[in-house]
Amino acid sequence: MTTVLIDYDSGNLHSAQKAFERMAAETGAGAVVVTSDPDAVRAADRIVLPGDGAFPHCRAQLFGVSGLADAIVEAVEADAKPFMGICVGMQMMAKRGFEYQETPGFGWIDGEIHKITPSDPTLPVPHMGWNDLVIERDHPVRSPDRSSPCAARAGTIW
């Protein structure tokens, strides 16, 4: 089994690569390959599209790599391969985004991506830094041995 992380010169590729390599090593999930080669995308078993930055810029970068977007669409729509988008990679699954300008997405999710405008203009978006997490209810994703969880993440919106 091969998981490809698509390299289209958009941001958080290195951290995503390290996370998937660790997951693969711990679970035996197979090879993790970083690529911008459309043929490697077609040959992969699973596809991950990371992304960091503005929706229109990421889309332009992705569609600027010859054949790459077509290979993703073919793998997902025709071959039904599992696909995961991270950050802007996830946003591009929607019909369109409205960050700075209207920009088409893949259209796999019937939705639109709009920039968040906080009620307090002094609040930064995206939020970056350390925060204490308040657990409202148990969830299988949360490890039961963490009594005082906190998280650091750049650009995560919870």
Regions found by a protein language model. Name each.
Residues M1-F83, V88, Q101, D110-P124:
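N-terminal beta1-alpha1 cap of cysteine-dependent amidohydrolase-like domains
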Residues Q91-M93:
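Conserved catalytic-site region of short-chain dehydrogenase/reductase
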Residues K95-W158:
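Pocket-forming structural segment of enzyme catalytic cores
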